A protein has these predicted regions:
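Metal-dependent amide/peptide-bond hydrolase catalytic core
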Residues: 1-123
């Protein structure tokens, strides 16, 4: 959450005020650039719509998770309600042998398109 991120930022900066070695100084620069994705009521509505479509159209279930990483979704979530990670299934992300399961492309794209169509009626 943003509150947790701000708490950690304060704690890290407070460490700089505690000299461990006499005669030394620690300077911390920078700070929070991109915040976490917050689960707002609008985002929950989007999750509900997507989950229902996946269940009704494909007999599947949607599992929500928090990855703790940084994506384009973190950037857009600052301005608009954002769902992330709706693309094809992939394996070994960010490695030399990353791969995707192309069998998931059509159902995932269809679910996204149906969700987008329904959300235009809601928002």
């Amino acid at each position: 959450s943003v509150a947790e991120q701000e708490r950690l930022d304060r704690e890290i900066k407070a460490l700089a005020d505690k000299a461990v070695v006499a005669g030394t100084k620690v300077e911390i620069t920078g700070g929070i650039v991109t915040g976490p994705m917050e689960k707002t009521p609008q985002v929950q509505k989007m999750v509900d719509v997507y989950s229902r479509i996946v269940r009704d159209e494909f007999g599947g279930n949607v599992t929500e998770w928090v990855a703790g990483g940084l994506t384009d979704g973190n950037r857009t979530a600052k301005y608009i309600p954002t769902l992330d990670a709706l693309g094809v299934e992939n394996y070994d992300e960010h490695t030399d042998h990353e791969s995707v399961d192309l069998k998931t492309a059509v159902p995932r794209t269809t679910a996204f398109a149906l969700t987008l169509a329904e959300l235009t009626k809601i928002f």
